[in-house]
Regions:
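Hydrophobic/aromatic beta-strand patches that form the interior of the parallel beta-sheet core
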Residues: 30-32, 78, 108
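Flexible, glycine-rich phosphate/dinucleotide-binding loops
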Residues: 15, 38, 56
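Beta1/beta-strand and adjacent pyrophosphate-binding region of the FAD-binding site
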Residues: 1-14
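N-terminal Rossmann-like dinucleotide/flavin-binding domain of flavoprotein oxidoreductases
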Residues: 42-101
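Glycine-rich FAD pyrophosphate-binding loop
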Residues: 7-9, 23-43
Length: 108
C-alpha cells in the first residue's frame, strides 16, 4: 500500500493553496481532485476580488494558474475520489473510487 507524507482532498482554491505551502515546506503533497477538478470556481465566469488579478479573471484560468503553481512546488495531482477514510489511528487510511487504498501521515 502506498504511504504518502501529505494528502490533500479536493482541488479547489483551498486545496491548491495548501499544496503550494506544503510543497514549499518540503512535504511532497499529493492532491486528489475529487468529483469536480478545480472546484466550484471552474463554474464561475468572472472573479473580480482575487489578489493579483486587477482586471478580474475567469474561474477556469484562476484554477489553472493555481494548479501550475502547486505543481511548480512539487505537488502531484491525481484524478480520484475518496470514498472512505479511517482517521481513528495514524497513519490515516483512505480508500478511493478505484478500490485503491493509501496511507498518509497528514490529511488536509
Amino acid at each position: 500500500m502506498e504511504h504518502l507524507k501529505t494528502l490533500i482532498l479536493g482541488s479547489g482554491p483551498a486545496g491548491y493553496t495548501a499544496a503550494i505551502y506544503a510543497g514549499r515546506a518540503g512535504f511532497a503533497p499529493v492532491i486528489y481532485e475529487g468529483l469536480q477538478p478545480g472546484g466550484q470556481l471552474t463554474q464561475t465566469t468572472e472573479i473580480e476580488n482575487f489578489p493579483g488579478y486587477p482586471e478580474g479573471v475567469e474561474g477556469n484560468q484562476l484554477m489553472e494558474d493555481l494548479r501550475k503553481q502547486a505543481e511548480r512546488f512539487g505537488a502531484e495531482v491525481r484524478n480520484k475520489v475518496c470514498v472512505k477514510a479511517d482517521l481513528s489511528k495514524r497513519p490515516f487510511t483512505l480508500k478511493f473510487d478505484d478500490e485503491s487504498e493509501v496511507l498518509t501521515d497528514t490529511l488536509i
